Design a protein with these regions (language model features):
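Ligand-binding pocket segment of bilobal, Venus flytrap-like solute-binding proteins
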Residues: 1-54
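Sec-exported extracytoplasmic/periplasmic mature domains
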Residues: 7-11, 27, 31, 86-94, ...
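Soluble non-cytosolic domains of exported or imported proteins
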Residues: 17-20, 35, 75-79, 149-156
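Solvent-exposed loop/turn segments at secondary-structure junctions
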Residues: 38-42, 58-61, 91-92
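Short beta-strand->loop
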Residues: 49-61, 72
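Short amphipathic alpha-helical segments
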Residues: 65-67
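Mature extracytoplasmic/periplasmic domains
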Residues: 70-142
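Conserved C-terminal helix/tail region of periplasmic/extracytoplasmic solute-binding proteins
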Residues: 133-172
């Protein structure tokens, strides 16, 4: 009710409901500040539009994800599930996620699937030594630029709130 009233009074341009809405609001210039996911920042930057993921003084809001197995799995299904988890954590997925601004549960394995320049930029918070691109090849940063918020340790060390899927999620 508080946010709805504030929106009606002109405080907010919109409450986005989808990833694409958040990107389009920022890319169009309709908004200049919003809560966005890291890949949404990447999507805006890939259009050649400057966009900064501004670290908050209070700290970051962060999400964690995981893979769980049903206790009813056995035999070939259990083997396939473990094979999938092993592949998922082996580094390729982590490298793909990192090029959007996310991290893998095992970020070190991503290093084998990234260039030294990419690893330095996305994980270590170093200046890019060459162009940084998204997973789809769009230019995100030029040589000399650094990632918003710094290194993995700096970013994860500043998380103030870990979000999780709420109980009501299944009804939304």
């Amino acid at each position: 009710a508080i946010f709805t009233e504030a929106k009606q009074n002109g405080q907010f341009r919109a409450f986005w409901k989808t990833f694409d809405e958040s990107v389009n609001l920022m890319a169009s210039g309709e908004v200049v500040i919003q809560s966005m996911w890291s890949p949404a920042i990447t999507a805006v930057k890939s259009r050649g539009i400057p966009c900064v993921y501004q670290p908050l003084e209070e700290g970051y809001r962060s999400w964690g994800g995981g893979i769980g197995l049903s206790k009813s799995l056995s035999g070939m299904e259990l083997d396939a599930a473990y094979e999938y988890i092993n592949w998922y954590l082996s580094g390729w997925v982590g490298g793909f996620l990192m090029r959007q601004g996310y991290y893998s549960a095992v970020p070190e394995t991503s290093k084998d699937f990234m260039s030294e320049n990419e690893w330095g930029y996305w994980f270590e918070g170093k200046e890019a030594t060459d162009v940084i691109t998204s997973p789809t090849g769009d230019v995100l940063a030029q040589a000399g630029e650094v990632r918003d918020g710094g290194s993995f340790e700096e970013r994860m060390g500043a998380v103030a709130c870990w979000n999780a899927v709420m109980d009501e999620n299944q009804y939304m």
